[in-house]
Design a protein with these regions (language model features):
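Structured C-terminal subdomain patch of bacterial secreted/periplasmic proteins
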Residues: 297, 301-302
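Short amphipathic alpha-helical segments
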Residues: 243
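Thiol-/selenol-based redox modules, centered on thioredoxin-like
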Residues: 333-336
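Active-site mouth of glycoside hydrolases
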Residues: 2-227, 233, 238-240, 251, ...
């Protein structure tokens, strides 16, 4: 790797010392079942303390100790104090259930353009039909205007919560380069690391690699050269997943798998969770309670009539908290106890 390293990156020794204070952790990428995207989760009119408290109680019963949660720059732009107040409330709910979440700032996945206010209804049977990229792509061309706005957002959040012991870590950018952005996302990725380092948070920073192809090498090299904790996404089966773990272990830093478990892709709790536990990799699967994001449906396999998929893609629980697969839930509890 010959990527630039922004000043302030933790040494491997500091990162490993930080990780040594924690037992092995499992958790999930989380959004409440009644929100269809990040904007709906965090907006004042739709933030739902009671549902979050209920669902995190179920997460606690599974033995989950962390969550990965996506923030919203659009909500911040329209209601900065409100977003921080709701984040504080969310962290209090997490703490009451023994959970330390990580927060995600930027995202290159799904819908390119988004707006504040009431969100479109989810498309029946379509995976993540209303999830939004962040920042909205219509804002990205005018970087002279956008970057100062993002500076205020990122640094206000990190100044407010960067020394809050309820936060596990900061995931600065989800899947940079996705949605055909490619290396055009590198300036924004670099920018968010610079902004975050200037705040000197007590928690580690990361940005997970997710596609190991030649065209993504500039992004991957930058992410691996700047993350305090190495994070990655892997929806493959156990053999290929373990190869990825061993390759990343050579970097000498703690590892977090921040997305896995897609049943129809061959990524199962029963095969991947024990692998992650054995290698002491933080295990974060996509989805807790199935709901408006429709992530029980697979990528590219819509069910416009709303019929149930033969096999759920993501998610663990039904909206009433009952398991999709009782045997699977029992297995998760056995791994996390």
């Amino acid at each position: 790797m010959f990527a630039e390293t922004i000043a302030g990156r933790w040494t491997a020794e500091k990162a490993n010392k930080w990780y040594a204070q924690y037992p092995w952790m499992a958790g999930c990428d989380y959004i409440p079942a009644n929100a269809d995207n990040q904007i709906e989760m965090w907006s004042e009119a739709t933030y739902d303390h009671a549902t979050i408290d209920k669902e995190l109680g179920w997460a606690e019963q599974l033995g989950f100790k962390t969550l990965r949660v996506f923030l919203s720059s659009i909500v911040y732009a329209h209601d900065s104090q409100g977003l921080k107040t709701r984040m504080d409330d969310f962290l209090s709910v997490c703490a009451s259930h023994g959970i330390k979440p990580m927060f995600v700032f930027f995202d290159d996945c799904w819908n390119a353009v988004s707006s504040y206010g009431p969100q479109p209804r989810p498309l029946t049977g379509v995976h993540n039909s209303q999830w939004v990229q962040d920042p909205s792509c219509d804002l990205r061309l005018d970087t002279a205007k956008l970057y100062p706005q993002l500076k205020r957002y990122v640094q206000d959040i990190l100044t407010t919560f960067g020394h809050d012991s309820r936060v596990l870590m900061w995931d600065l950018y989800n899947e940079p380069g996705n949605s055909h952005h490619g290396t055009t996302s590198l300036p924004l990725l670099r920018n968010v690391f610079i902004l975050a380092r200037q705040c000197h948070p007590q928690q580690p920073l990361t940005a997970g690699i997710w596609r190991d192809t030649k065209d993504f090498k500039p992004l991957n090299d930058f992410q691996l050269s700047n993350s305090d904790i190495i994070s990655y996404h892997d929806y493959h089966g156990s053999i290929r997943h373990e190869q990825e773990i061993k390759k990343l272990q050579a970097l000498g830093r703690p590892l977090a798998c921040t997305e896995y478990m897609a049943r129809t892709q061959g990524s199962f709790f029963r095969t991947i969770m024990p692998l992650l536990k054995r290698h002491r990799v933080i295990a974060i699967n996509w989805g807790l309670v199935t709901g408006k994001t429709n992530t029980r449906y697979a990528w590219g396999d819509p069910h416009p009539d709303g019929s149930e998929p033969d096999v759920w893609f993501h998610d663990i629980l039904r909206p009433d908290g009952s398991p999709y697969l009782t045997q699977e839930v029992n297995f998760i509890k056995a791994q996390t106890k």
